[in-house]
A protein has these predicted regions:
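Hydrophobic alpha-helical connector segments
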Residues: 60, 74-111, 161-165, 196
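Hydrophobic/aromatic residues within well-ordered alpha-helical segments
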Residues: 54, 61, 65, 69, ...
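Secondary-structure edge/capping motif, primarily at the C-terminal ends of alpha-helices
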Residues: 76, 119, 179-183
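Helix-turn-helix
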Residues: 14, 22-56, 60-64
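Short helix-capping/turn signature of helix-turn-helix
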Residues: 51, 116-123
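Conserved hydrophobic residue
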Residues: 28-29, 124, 154
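C-terminal peripheral helix-coil segments that are non-catalytic and often amphipathic
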Residues: 2, 92-103, 135-151, 155, ...
Length: 243
């Protein structure tokens, strides 16, 4: 067998990538350095050469998980603040988080499991992810809320915009979390794509957007133009929800 010699940076990245699914499945406290070394195909001595402690490795995972910016978030920055963008970004957020739209299924599953385990431990991974999401997405969301209200398509709400943002995100996230077990734990009626579309309406209605605006800006063609690869419910289903 030919041994491939990796430089320090590549070796560290390999160890992090090997540790990610372990932390996702078992959590930080229950994952041993021996398991990490075996998964990374290195000795524990080499593991400790790159990461002095398991905590140091976990901290690197926190940085690694937020290092790359999702291309979809960069695309979002270029969109004009409007009612249409508010509807489109909500459709994408729910589909991306809850069904894995435009993402690698294995990576998405790992991220969700890391989040759930983080809630049960120190919460640090979840805090960093949420801070990252807020920094990238909330400014556009808030601008869209203001634009929709100015256009007369959004009624004034007693709910703080920040809470509207997080409550919507948490609806989408919980749809994903209840599907983590082999047999989905959420007793929803209908297929996941149908439930995701209903979740979009639930969120947008809660924000205060009118049914007419939701239906108008949920046209399949417009959504696909903004987010290539998105195939939402047929227009007939959207119209039925607006009645």
């Amino acid at each position: 067998m030919v041994s491939i010699r990796l430089d320090g940076g590549e070796r560290r990245k390999g160890i992090v990538e090997a540790a990610l699914p372990l932390f996702a499945r078992k959590g930080f406290a229950r994952t041993t350095t021996r398991e990490i070394a075996e998964a990374a195909q290195v000795s524990e001595a080499l593991l400790f050469k790159h990461f002095a402690t398991k905590v140091a490795l976990y901290e690197e995972i926190l940085r690694f998980g937020c290092r790359d910016v999702d291309p979809a978030l960069e695309r979002l920055q270029a969109l004009e603040a409007s009612t249409a963008t508010l509807v489109h970004m909500t459709h994408f957020m729910v589909r991306h988080v809850a069904t894995g739209l435009l993402s690698d299924p294995a990576e998405q599953d790992t991220k969700h499991r890391l989040m759930v385990n983080s809630f049960l431990e120190d919460g640090e991974f979840a805090r960093i992810v949420f801070d990252n999401i807020f920094a990238w997405v909330y400014p556009k969301f808030a601008a869209c809320i203001a634009a929709a209200e100015a256009a007369g398509e959004l009624r004034t709400s007693p709910i703080a915009p920040e809470n509207c943002f997080w409550l919507g995100q948490h609806v989408a996230a919980m749809l994903a979390y209840v599907r983590l077990p082999r047999g989905a734990a959420g007793p929803y009626r209908g297929a996941i794509d149908e439930v995701a579309t209903q979740a979009v309406w639930f969120i947008l209605r809660g924000i205060g957007l009118s049914d007419a605006a939701i239906a108008r800006h949920s046209e399949p063609g417009a959504l696909a133009a903004t987010w290539p690869g998105m195939t939402p419910e047929p227009r007939a289903a959207l119209v039925a929800m607006a009645r």
